[in-house]
UniProtKB/Swiss-Prot annotation:
HAMAP family given in the database record: ISPT (MF_01139)
Organism: Corynebacterium efficiens (strain DSM 44549 / YS-314 / AJ 12310 / JCM 11189 / NBRC 100395)
Residues spanning the signal sequence: none
Protein name per the record: Isoprenyl transferase 1
Keywords, alphabetical: Magnesium, Metal-binding, Transferase
Gene Ontology CC terms: plasma membrane
C-alpha cells in the first residue's frame, strides 16, 4: 500500500525551498528541543529514555539543515538549570547523551564551531571537563557555529553577567559611581554566556508548549517565536523549513 504522505513530503519540501529562495532568513536560530519523553510514551516505549536517544540523533540533522540554508549560528537548548533537579539516573543518562552529541558535533568532518553556554559549575566536574575538552577541538573549524545550552537558565545567565560585570569593574579599580554610570544594556550583553554573538532572530519550541521558560531571556527580547505541536524526536526538515518560511513572512519590529 502506498504511503501517500511520504510520497508528498519531497514535493512539499521542494515547494518550501522554492518559496525560501531569495527570502529573508535568520542568521541565528535557537531551538528548544522539547517533548522527548512524551514522544516515547505516546510511541509505546516502556523505557522513556529512548526519547532522549532519538532526540539526540536529531540534533546533527538540525545542524545540517541549518548549513543547507546558510543559517550561520544555531543554539540548541539541551539541559536547563531546572532539569538538574531530576533523579540521578535520568541525569546521568542525559549527561552521557549530551556528551556524545557534543563529541559528534566536534568531529573534524562535521566542522562545527561548538560553544558551551550555561553555568557549567552547576554540572558534575567530570562531565563539565569532558564538554570543555571536546569543544576546544573545534576552535579552528569553519562550519556552522553551534551553541550547546547546558546547565542553562535565563535568570541565572543575567545574574552571572551582572556578577561578572561588577567583578571586572572592581578589578579595574572603578568607584561605585563609575560602575553605576557604566551599567547599561550593552555592558550587560558583553558579559552574557553568548557575548560577541548576535541575538537569535528566530526561536523554535517543539512539543506544543507555548512559552520560552527562561530560554535566552535577555537575547530573545526581539526574536520571532515559532511554536509547533511536533515533539522533538519527530521534528522533520519540512517542519524546520516551515518555520523559516513563517519567519520570512513576518515584519520584524524590534519593539517599535
Amino acid at each position: 500500500m502506498l504511503n501517500l504522505p511520504r510520497l508528498l513530503y519531497p514535493l512539499y519540501e521542494r515547494r518550501l525551498l522554492k518559496e525560501l529562495n531569495g527570502a529573508r532568513q535568520p542568521g541565528h536560530v535557537a531551538i528548544m528541543c522539547d517533548g522527548n519523553r512524551r514522544w516515547a510514551r505516546e510511541a509505546g516505549f516502556v523505557d522513556l529514555s529512548h526519547g532522549h536517544r532519538v532526540g539526540a540523533k536529531k540534533i546533527g540533522e538540525l545542524v545540517r539543515w541549518c548549513d543547507d540554508v546558510d543559517v550561520d549560528l544555531v543554539t540548541v537548548y539541551l539541559l536547563s538549570t531546572e532539569n538538574l533537579g531530576r533523579d540521578e539516573a535520568e541525569l546521568q543518562l542525559l549527561y552521557d547523551i549530551i556528551g556524545d552529541v557534543v563529541a559528534e558535533l566536534s568531529l573534524p568532518e562535521t566542522n562545527c564551531r561548538v560553544r558551551l553556554v550555561g553555568h557549567l559549575d552547576l554540572l558534575p566536574k567530570e562531565f563539565a571537563e569532558r564538554l570543555r575538552g571536546t569543544v576546544c577541538e573545534t576552535v579552528d573549524h569553519t562550519g556552522v557555529a553551534v551553541n550547546i545550552a547546558v546547565g542553562y537558565g535565563g535568570r541565572q545567565e543575567i545574574v552571572d553577567a551582572v556578577r561578572d560585570l561588577l567583578t571586572s569593574a572592581r578589578d579595574e579599580g572603578k568607584t561605585l559611581d563609575e560602575v553605576i554610570e557604566s551599567v547599561d544594556a550593552q555592558a550587560i550583553s558583553t558579559h552574557l554566556y553568548t557575548s560577541g554573538q548576535p541575538d537569535p532572530d528566530l526561536v523554535i519550541r517543539t512539543s506544543g508548549e507555548q512559552r520560552l521558560s527562561g530560554f535566552m531571556l535577555w537575547q530573545s527580547a526581539y526574536s520571532e517565536i515559532w511554536f509547533t505541536d511536533t515533539y522533538w524526536p519527530a521534528f522533520r526538515r519540512i517542519d524546520f523549513l516551515r518555520a523559516l518560511r513563517d519567519y520570512s513572512q513576518r515584519s520584524r519590529r524590534f519593539g517599535k
